[in-house]
């Protein structure tokens, strides 16, 4: 079963809406230095518990972010659409295993940039 929840630890909304970030410049960085990854519908960009060190910029398609709880229930914790940034922000920043899975709900194109590259921004 899938459940909807408010995943407070996931703060990509804050990242996407940050007034301190020049998003046009940031998008340009992803398109110039990022690696294009094409995912088919139902392929995973990240699986829960995997290590991740990339942030994605979605140029086409839609991603669903889900988390499986200790009872085995799958919770929808967010979506990322075209022109959104997508990652498991808390695990990326804290350098821990992914707390969510990021799955393509349509065919998707996403430019992946390592956190180390973004830190130089």
Language-model segments: residues:
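A short beta-strand-loop-beta hairpin characteristic of the jelly-roll/cupin
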Residues: 64-76
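Glycine- and acidic-residue-biased ligand/ion/polar-headgroup-sensing regions
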Residues: 53, 57-64, 83
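Cyclic nucleotide-binding regulatory module and flanking cytosolic helices
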Residues: 3-41, 90-91
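Short phosphate-coordinating micro-motif centered on Lys-Gly-acidic
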Residues: 45-50
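Short beta-strand segments in beta-sandwich/barrel cores
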Residues: 35, 44, 62-67, 85, ...
